[in-house]
Amino acid sequence: MIQQLKFLRRLSGLLFISGIVTSTFNTLRAQDKILMTRDFVYEEVFKTVLLYPALSGNNDELNTPIVPLTQNAPLILEFDELGEGSSNLYLKIIHCNADWTISTLSTVQYLDGYNETFIDDRKSSIGTRIPYTHYKVILPRVKVTGNYLAVVYRSSDESDLILTKRFIVYDSKVSIIPEQKPSTGINQRFTHQQLDFNILYPNMEIINPRGSVKVVIRQNKRWDKIIDDLEPLYIKEDIRKLEYNFFNLENNFPGGNEFRTFSTRSVKFNDINIDKISIQPDFAEVYLKRDVSTNNQAYALYPDIDGQFVVELYETKTKEVEPDYIFTNFTLDTKGLVPGRVFVVGAFNNYELSPESELLFDPETNTYRLKTLLKQGYYNYRYAFLPKGSRVSDEIFFEGSHFATQNVYDFIVYYRPPGARTDMVIGYKSININGRN
């Protein structure tokens, strides 16, 4: 912990030297940390958290951590700790209900063996200006389906939380048949995406589907973009079919826009959306090209990875310990103050509206600016607007929304039989909207 605090002070000094400081680095005491059953990082020196099934070896980190119970491919959790030292870290697994409250199942009901894994795979960064330790661990196999939380903590003290990360294990007991349709709303026809679907369950019995079945539809792997309160419009028990067709926009998502992108896979030249690179003895810094609002602009198709990011270097194939951490500068030209707060969001920061993701207004340039520390790679991002007095952000404010946007949707089906203590995951389906392969 002492080494960590020393590094934080040094890093804050680098932030001051390199320009605007928009956030402070904090290390909470163990007694001040509260377990969050969502993707969350409790200390700012821990960064670049990835959880994925190792399926092919080629950009596996883009794989969704939703896996079948019978899958042989391991789930991999990896992350970095900034600084020259390392910590003794442990992993445990928590089973959750469909609403992500902690279930009443005991550990022995969902896990074989002791629920504490020491993370012994740790490597120091090689040749980087900002040092870090890379951690990697294979998650233990679970015995039952459901929502799960991977929890990392320090030195066998479960209250000294480091990070939490969600994953799901399912059994394909039902078939999900989705169908994208034009929105039934006249005003939403060109801005929203409507998803009807049917659930077929020929090989199982479902009792009281309206009360026992829960479906979650998730946009672009985001837990802050879900619909989870749908009930079947028709229940056809004779053919074991649930029909989810609606006419009051219950199953409509704003299409949003394609994600903005940038690449720091090299600091030897200006890569995608990079305006300027500055190399100093102790750090490297990049400045993204100035962004503007794309609201009220016509839809334009360009490739993205649905909000995700990939750690990568052009000069080497080693992703874990050779990419450096780079001060990355975002600038949004709003032509003046806006009536609220401005954030940059993406999978790289769990779409968190936090001080670390907030852009501050710079009266000298009449723009909103943010400097943050990110590992080299290829990133997707958006700008989110938080109106004064609101707790709900609005990405359409800066990005616009189009029915033609290419998005990925997950359908997750839960079932709690009568008398059961928790929810089973009995089906999963992922689809790409508007033509992305």
Task: Kindly label every feature range from the protein language model.
Residues 129-155:
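Ligand-binding face of N-terminal immunoglobulin V-set domains in extracellular IgSF glycoproteins
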Residues 287-338, 425-434:
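Basic K/R-rich, polyanion-interacting modules in nucleoproteins and related proteins
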Residues 209-297:
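Long, internal scaffold/assembly segments composed of regular secondary structure
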Residues 143, 154-162, 266-272, 386-401:
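Short acidic/polar inter-strand loop motif in beta-rich domains
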Residues 1-33:
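Bacterial Sec-dependent N-terminal signal peptides
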Residues 110-135, 223-230, 329-376, 388-417:
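Aromatic-rich carbohydrate-binding modules that target alpha-glucans
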Residues 34-41, 169-192, 402-427:
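Low-complexity, Pro/Ser/Thr- and charge-rich linker/hinge segments at domain boundaries
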Residues 42-93, 188-199, 315-330:
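Contiguous beta-strand segments within globular domains
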